[in-house]
Amino acid sequence: MNDRSAAITIGGQEFELLLTTRATKEIAARYGGLENLGEKLMQSESFEMALDEIVWLITLLANQPILIHNLRDPDKRELLTTEVVELLTSPFDLAAYKSAVMEAMSKGTKRNVESENDEKTRISGDG
């Protein structure tokens, strides 16, 4: 697991949740931006729709590390589907995954200011 991801277990297998630029674009296309995500999830017209959205988001974030692996490695891994996530989880699991989703999204959007300051110090010669 890397420092930009959070881990969850689905059906006894650990998956990383990772917010990538690609995932951010898909979230933006579906919800109008990351800032609208929480509001849209809370405003789902029914419990079923809310579950569908959460399952979609978990599947999207869990597939990012698999897609990266498949890009770099000839040993391809199978992507998760929403159907698999639905079958191998319970509504209780989905509620528990909320903190991991928020952690992955927070890590994916945070800025590493310290490294920027280090770079500026090196360039200016003040360090």
Describe each region flagged by the PLM.
Residues 1-11, 29, 35-49, 66-127:
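Charged interaction scaffolds used for protein-protein
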